[in-house]
Amino acid sequence: MLDTESRWAIAESFFKTRGLVRQHLDSFNDFLRNKLQQVIYEQGEIVTEVPGLKIKLGKIRYEKPSIRETDKGPMREITPMEARLRNLTYSSPIFLSMIPVENNIEGEPIEIYIGDLPIMLKSVADPTSNLPIDKLIEIGEDPKDPGGYFIVNGSEKVIIAQEDLATNRVLVDYGKSGSNITHVAKVTSSAAGYRVQVMIERLKDSTIQISFATVPGRIPFAIIMRALGFVTDRDIVYAVSLDPQIQNELLPSLEQASSITSAEEALDFIGNRVAIGQKRENRIQKAEQVIDKYFLPHLGTSPEDRKKKGYYLASAVNKILELYLGRREPDDKDHYANKRVRLAGDLFTSLFRVAFKAFVKDLVYQLEKSKVRGRRLSLTALVRADIITERIRHALATGNWVGGRTGVSQLLDRTNWLSMLSHLRRVVSSLARGQPNFEARDLHGTQWGRMCPFETPEGPNSGLVKNLALLAQVSVGINESVVERVAYELGVVSVEDVIRRISEQNEDVEKYMSWSKVYLNGRLLGYYEDGKELAKKIRESRRQGKLSDEVNVAYIATDYLNEVHINCDAGRVRRPLIIVNNGTPLVDTEDIKKLKNGEITFDDLVKQGKIEFIDAEEEENAYVALNPQDLTPDHTHLEIWPSAILGIIASIIPYPEHNQSPRNTYQSAMAKQSLGLYASNYQIRTDTRAHLLHYPQMPLVQTRMLGVIGYNDRPAGANAILAIMSYTGYNMEDSIIMNKSSIERGMYRSTFFRLYSTEEVKYPGGQEDKIVTPEAGVKGYKGKDYYRLLEDNGVVSPEVEVKGGDVLIGKVSPPRFLQEFKELSPEQAKRDTSIVTRHGENGIVDLVLITETLEGNKLVKVRVRDLRIPEIGDKFATRHGQKGVVGILIDQVDMPYTAKGIVPDIILNPHALPSRMTIGQIMEAIGGKYAALSGKPVDATPFLETPKLQEMQKEILKLGHLPDSTEVVYDGRTGQKLKSRILFGIVYYQKLHHMVADKMHARARGPVQILTRQPTEGRAREGGLRFGEMERDCLIGFGTAMLIKDRLLDNSDKAVVYICDQCGYVGWYDRSKNRYVCPVHGDKSVLHPVTVSYAFKLLIQELMSMVISPRLILGEKVNLGGASNE
């Protein structure tokens, strides 16, 4: 029998052979190997307007990532680190062979450079994917870096997996209540870059109507079938179903189209919708075009594919009628069998297709232009390689993809090791987060083992942003023609053959009605006598390796339905399971021994047919046991590792099954904010902002997954001695008390790095920036003191202390506008654009990097580091969602101590536990204590319970402590023994990146906004604290009139305006006469100064612009002393 260790060996082998970001790498590798060439083949050849000239397209290939320093220089290979440091794009040049054909005479094939393709790190095109560890260290890479991201303009970009409803599948549902549509079937047909939705609706009058893009209105079902070549009613009826009851339901639809009897008439009917008022031939031609190109394009776009489309449409209509007759349930849109995840390869294919089309369009234009001028054909000179390069780079840099999707690529989150891995495994749903799609946000049963049940954000994205579970993989997809061939070889009879046998050979309809329908990727292939048997045969040939392991098959049998669904498309989330035969798993102890010795790997077990990947649809046929002891002869599969239902982050939580579920969700969010060692090459990286914990520790209470994820090598936290007690009252409301002496010994110290960089840009017209120390005459000169740290080259030197406002890189630029330039002397014309340390930040210059960009401009990067020692207000959290800020630091002498002299590092208030039910934390405290006393880490993997709590308590008793983990404690200030025993244990605490030093902010005077003249907002702009409407209401309630005036007028935007005493308008200042003048009465009236809020003056003037005439009526000013004067 497989014990825990054996199953763990299988799971461990999975992570070793597949890594943690396999899904992106597989997808991108498939793009490089197959899809890239496929896009070229789709284009086939470039046809021009020039008579007799076309260009055939051949093979495409890519080289190793490289750059060309200057326009004419040689190509040179680069490393990812060089790309990061010099703000380059890590991309490979791509070459396409082209054959010019002039007057049917083929020329010599020429290979032409057509652009650069950004390369995913660790993919097949990346040379670092097979370098040994020492070589990786030599080129400045973190040897454990998993790859799966791109480097664009020096920054790391991840492509986020996009979850979508499966395309090319018919989904049926009830119509909206109250409308005249009773049932709906939708299919989004997607092929070669465009998606077309086809809607099939059953109306209250029992007719069936079809609507799709480019054809206005609805088309009756029978008419579109005739247009597709099903001329007689009998053809149409048998295409839909062999069942007389369903055939009867088609009568109203057939009657609706009774006047149209031929394919030509049907095409003319459609032509009248798309080409109104044209000649009949034109109408028919246009209708044929529309049907071929925009109706179900995934089945093909040539006239030969019309029959195929007819059968597809008929099977969709059959589905609607089955729903109407109560023979099937509506499709569940949230079932994971109906979802597909689009990964980097998919998204890159659609992006490259659009870029390549733009490239072809430009090439055609250039060819025609050069032919008009009568030049010799020289392809090399006409190809503009930057079209593809820029299109792809721009999409990756901004995240704006083709098809109007935003946020597809994001900056890789490098807060710590976990946050990076989690970002690479994230899955985003395409639903709008503004709507309350409750069902879509819920955890669905089919997500078991595919999506992490805990890791999802709080707030508007909850349930829409998910993360892959540990063992989940995403299918890459194989060509369906292979599977189709196998199905026909196994004896599947095509729909056409069945109809032919019934109509021509007069075979019995009843016979075929009992047969199973066979679907391949949602398309009806045909009929088979025994569906269960067929599914079994397909599974067997998959397990024997005759069929690709990408293929999944499900047999669906209900009272009415009898269907086999075969899937082999891309984007299905699948999970591996051990195959069980007669109650015994096929993986035996012999296999485990070989696994542990490294003789075989996980992939070998898949090849041997002992483990298989199951998608959500096939899992409907599986009966999976959670543990070997649960197996019965009925079981078909066994889970490899029960806690693999969790994602990467949730699997670091010890004892998560003892916590209330939302607590695990909170921890999943906070683990991404904890500080640790985010990359082992941090010293040479130039991240915009980075945090580094000085002394990260491995948790004493481990879960098995920590090792395979790599958390033990890149931890983010430290083990703290925790006492759960109320002490001094400074740990109320989730704050914690920390031992000041522990902090002085270096506990939870961290460093914050911030990068400042600038480049000498060259402007059109020969002007350029200069990195130098600015001279006193320059516009915007800051004063000598600010430039004191600069060296002769205008850059600060390393290990210099800097404070907010100090210049790190001196730089002068030409003026923004030309008219300035003409008036001023050349020296005055320059403006100071130096890079200064951020306001309120200080630190030490850590690294200065001077290099060149690809254009040959000088690039300077300066990294400043700042030591962060924990202080009051810094945020900490355990691994159970228990977050709190430091309430006070107490010296060790004043902290409580146990009889053995142990002093806690952290004191947590007991009120943090009962209502939150984080029992996992109490168990961790006990486990940590046992680990520290016994000297071996404790395994707290979920669903295992090894070692059991009771056993640990017995051991703790043997080691001389109370089994309930409590201690007799003495008050540190008085030395008195406390009445209660206090729970002492060791808990892993994480320091989060919310620190007081980054948030503390106050201001007296400072900058104001130009428009309203009110103080700016926010810490970065030295803004004020807003005294809002509710605060104002409080002061009104208190009756403090002077205070209201002080806050809302004197200290905000007090302004004096001059008002005409006759008309009440705001006057203007006449410089020549040196006085204020009324815009209506000119000099004839007197203007009086009035103190108002500047925002009020602005409001008046904005109202005037809308032709509303506000006037201020002046009265006597009343002094508080009682005497009145003007």
Curated annotation (Swiss-Prot):
Compartment list: Cytoplasm
Q: Which cofactor does it need?
A: Zn(2+)
InterPro entries referenced in this protein's UniProt entry, alphabetically: DNA-dir_RNA_pol_su2 (IPR015712), DNA-dir_RNAP_su2_dom (IPR007120), DNA-dir_RNAP_su2_hyb_sf (IPR037033), RNA_pol_bsu_CS (IPR007121), RNA_pol_bsu_protrusion (IPR007644), RNA_pol_Rpb2_2 (IPR007642), RNA_pol_Rpb2_2_sf (IPR037034), RNA_pol_Rpb2_3 (IPR007645)
Give the EC number: 2.7.7.6
Gene Ontology MF terms: DNA binding; DNA-directed RNA polymerase activity; ribonucleoside binding; zinc ion binding
- What CDD domains does UniProt report for this protein, alphabetically? RNA_pol_B_RPB2 (cd00653)
One Pfam match, by short name? Answer: RNA_pol_Rpb2_6
Cysteine pairs bridged by disulfides in the record: none
Residues recorded as binding Zn(2+), renumbered to this chain, are C1060, C1063, C1078, H1081
- Please tell me whether the keyword Nucleotidyltransferase is annotated for this protein: yes
User: Listed GO cellular component terms?
Assistant: cytoplasm; DNA-directed RNA polymerase complex
- Tagged with keyword Signal: no
Q: Which reaction does it catalyse?
A: RNA(n) + a ribonucleoside 5'-triphosphate = RNA(n+1) + diphosphate
Enzyme class comes to transferase
Q: Which residues form the signal peptide?
A: none
Its domain of life?
Archaea
Q: Which UniProt keywords apply?
A: Cytoplasm, DNA-binding, DNA-directed RNA polymerase, Metal-binding, Nucleotidyltransferase, Transcription, Transferase, Zinc
Primary localization class, coarse: cytoplasm
The cofactor binding remark recorded in the entry reads: Binds 1 Zn(2+) per subunit.
Family that this chain belongs to = Belongs to the RNA polymerase beta chain family.
Quaternary organization: Part of the 13-subunit RNA polymerase complex. Interacts with TFS4. (Microbial infection) Binds viral protein RIP which blocks global transcription.
Q: NCBIfam families, from UniProt?
A: PRK08565.1, PRK09606.1, rpoB_arch
Q: What does this protein do?
A: DNA-dependent RNA polymerase (RNAP) catalyzes the transcription of DNA into RNA using the four ribonucleoside triphosphates as substrates. This subunit is involved in DNA promoter recognition.
Q: What is this protein called?
A: DNA-directed RNA polymerase subunit Rpo2
Tell me the classification of the organism that encodes this protein: Archaea, Thermoproteota, Thermoprotei, Sulfolobales, Sulfolobaceae
